[in-house]
C-alpha cells in the first residue's frame, strides 16, 4: 500500500480518481493499493519564541537577537485533526511507502517534509513531479516517480526561506515595537516592499510639475515637433520665424525596418503583469484564478519562472494550437500567419531554458471543456494564456520606421512615421485585445526627399507639463523588483 499526500483536497480527489482509490474515508480516500490524503496547506509551522524559553513571552530588547540553534515546530491549531489522520496513516502497517504529491515546487516540498518529519515517519518516499493535472499526465507521473533525494536541495532551500523569515520577522518586529512602544510588524519581504511604496509616494509628494513648450508644424497628414523649450518666449521666437515663410526644408529621411519578435509564453510573473495591465487583476487574483484553472486541468502548473517548453513537447504542439484556436473562436485569418505561412513552434521549445516547470499553456482538456461554465475571472485568464500560445507560434511583426527631420527658422522638427510591413503575431493579439492607440498607416501627404522644400498649413505652440512618477500598482511593482534584482546581480 502506498500513501499519497497531496496539498489540497481537490488535488487529492483528482489523483485518487486516476489511481482508482474510490473508497471515501474520514480525511482520505483508499483503494487499488493506494491511500490518498491531503495536507490542507501548512499543517506544521515554526514554533513561537516562547516555546524555546518562557522568558521570551515578554518582549524585551535585552533578549534580542533570538537565534535558535535547534529549530522547533508545532502543528497548526486549526489543522490538528488532519495532521492526526496523516500521522495515523503513516503508522499503518500496510503502508510501506509514501508519495510526495504536494505542489511541484519549493513550498510544496516543504509542506510534505515538515509533516513527514513531525510525524516521525521513517518510511521511504518518492516524488510525483508533474506540470499538468490531466489524467494522462498523472498516469505518466506515477509511472515515473522520482527519488526523494533528488529534491533534498529544494527542501533545504525552502527551510532557508522559512527560517530567514522567522529570524527577521521575530527579531525585527520585537526590536522596533520595543523602541517605538507600539506593535510594528517587520518582515523580510513586507518591509522592503513597504519602503519602496513610501519612497515612491515621497517622490510624488515632492514633485513639482514644470511646463514645457514645443512648436508644431502641420502639413498634409504630418505633424512635426520641435525640441522642448522650458521658456515660452523661446518657443514663440521660433514660431514667429516659421510663420514668416510657412515653408520647411527636408534635412533628412531615415528609414529603418524593425522587428517585434513573437512574444514568449507566460511564466507566472509575466502573466500577472499582463493580467494587471489588460484585465485590471491584482497579482493575487491572477494566481488564484490560474491555480483554479490548473486544478480543473485546463492549464499547466502556474508557479513557474520558465517561458519555454521542453523539446519533447514539440510533436503535440501543432495539434494543440489548432484546437485552442478553434476553442477560443480565433478566425483562421487572424491566428494563421499572413500569406498562408504556417505557424512555427520551434521558438517556444528550449529544454535548456526550462527550470522546474515549463511555461504556462492551455491543456488538451481545455479544448473539450465547457468554458461558458467558468467564472468570469478564470475565463479571462484562460483566454489570455490561450491567445499568448497562438501569438508565440506566429511570425514576427515587422514594420518600417521613417524618421523625418525638417528645418524651419533655424530649428529642427522631427516626425516618426511607422508603417506596418507584416502584421504577424499582432494580428492575433489585436483581434482579442485591440490597442487603444491607432496604428500609424502610410500617410497620403507630400512626397518628401532630402533638400525638398515643403509648405505647412499650420504652426502653433503646444504646452505640456512634466508628470510625477506613477503610484505603484502590482505591475509596476513587479518591474521595479526585477530591475532592482538585476541591478544588484549585475553589480556582482
Residue ranges and their predicted role:
Residues 9-10, 39-41, 103-109, 130-133, ...:
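An acidic- and aromatic-residue-enriched active-site/binding cleft used to recognize and process polar
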Residues 11, 107-111, 156, 160, ...:
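Hydrophobic (often cysteine-bearing) scaffold residues that line and stabilize catalytic clefts
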Residues 157-187:
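Amphipathic alpha-helical segments of the small helical/lid subdomains adjacent to P-loop NTPase cores
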Residues 281-352:
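Extended, well-ordered alpha-helical scaffold/bundle regions in very large, multi-domain proteins
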Residues 19, 23, 93, 118-123, ...:
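A generic secondary-structure signal for well-formed alpha-helical elements
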Residues 35, 43-76, 88, 181-291, ...:
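Long, highly charged, low-complexity internal segments
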Amino acid at each position: 500500500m502506498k500513501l499519497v499526500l497531496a496539498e489540497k483536497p481537490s488535488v487529492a480527489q483528482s489523483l485518487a480518481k486516476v489511481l482508482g482509490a474510490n473508497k471515501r474515508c474520514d480525511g482520505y480516500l483508499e483503494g487499488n493499493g493506494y491511500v490518498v490524503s491531503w495536507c490542507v496547506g501548512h499543517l506544521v509551522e515554526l514554533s513561537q519564541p516562547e516555546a524555546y524559553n518562557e522568558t521570551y513571552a515578554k518582549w524585551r530588547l535585552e533578549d534580542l537577537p533570538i537565534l535558535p540553534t535547534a529549530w522547533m515546530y508545532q502543528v497548526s491549531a486549526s489543522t490538528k485533526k488532519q495532521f492526526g489522520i496523516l500521522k495515523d496513516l503513516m503508522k499503518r502497517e500496510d503502508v510501506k511507502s509514501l508519495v510526495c504529491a504536494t505542489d511541484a515546487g519549493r513550498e510544496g516540498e516543504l509542506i510534505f517534509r515538515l509533516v513527514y518529519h513531525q510525524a516521525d515517519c521513517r518510511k521511504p518516499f518518492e516524488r510525483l513531479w508533474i506540470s499538468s493535472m490531466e489524467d494522462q499526465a498523472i498516469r505518466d507521473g506515477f509511472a515515473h516517480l522520482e527519488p526523494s533525494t533528488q529534491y533534498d536541495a529544494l527542501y533545504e532551500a525552502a527551510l532557508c526561506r522559512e527560517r530567514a523569515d522567522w529570524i527577521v520577522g521575530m527579531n525585527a518586529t520585537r526590536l522596533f515595537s520595543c523602541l517605538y512602544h507600539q506593535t510594528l510588524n517587520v518582515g523580510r519581504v513586507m518591509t522592503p516592499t513597504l519602503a519602496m511604496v513610501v519612497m515612491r509616494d515621497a517622490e510624488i509628494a515632492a514633485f513639482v510639475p514644470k511646463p514645457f513648450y514645443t512648436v508644431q508644424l502641420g502639413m498634409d497628414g504630418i505633424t512635426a515637433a520641435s525640441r522642448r523649450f522650458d521658456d515660452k518666449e523661446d518657443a514663440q521666437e521660433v514660431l514667429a520665424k516659421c510663420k514668416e515663410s510657412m515653408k520647411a526644408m527636408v534635412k533628412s529621411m531615415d528609414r529603418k525596418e524593425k522587428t517585434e519578435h513573437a512574444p514568449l509564453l507566460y511564466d507566472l510573473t509575466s502573466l500577472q503583469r499582463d493580467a494587471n495591465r489588460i484585465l485590471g487583476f491584482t497579482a493575487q487574483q491572477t494566481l488564484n484564478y490560474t491555480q483554479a484553472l490548473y486544478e480543473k486541468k485546463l492549464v499547466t502548473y502556474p508557479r513557474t519562472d520558465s517561458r519555454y517548453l521542453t523539446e519533447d513537447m514539440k510533436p503535440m504542439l501543432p495539434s494543440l494550437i489548432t484546437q485552442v484556436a478553434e476553442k477560443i473562436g480565433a478566425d483562421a485569418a487572424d491566428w494563421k500567419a499572413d500569406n498562408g505561412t504556417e505557424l512555427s513552434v520551434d521558438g517556444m521549445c528550449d529544454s535548456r531554458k526550462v527550470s522546474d516547470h515549463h511555461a504556462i499553456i492551455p491543456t488538451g482538456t481545455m479544448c473539450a471543456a465547457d468554458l461558458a461554465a467558468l467564472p468570469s475571472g478564470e475565463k479571462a485568464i484562460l483566454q489570455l494564456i490561450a491567445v499568448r500560445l497562438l501569438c508565440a507560434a506566429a511570425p514576427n511583426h515587422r514594420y518600417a520606421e521613417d524618421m523625418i527631420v525638417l528645418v524651419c527658422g533655424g530649428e529642427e522638427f522631427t516626425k516618426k512615421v511607422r508603417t506596418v510591413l507584416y502584421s504577424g503575431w499582432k494580428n492575433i493579439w489585436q483581434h482579442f485585445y485591440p490597442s487603444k492607440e491607432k496604428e500609424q498607416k502610410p500617410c497620403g501627404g507630400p512626397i518628401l526627399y532630402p533638400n525638398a522644400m515643403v509648405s505647412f498649413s499650420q504652426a502653433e505652440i503646444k504646452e505640456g507639463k512634466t508628470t510625477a512618477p506613477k503610484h505603484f500598482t502590482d505591475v509596476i511593482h513587479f518591474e521595479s523588483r526585477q530591475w532592482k534584482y538585476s541591478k544588484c546581480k549585475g553589480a556582482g
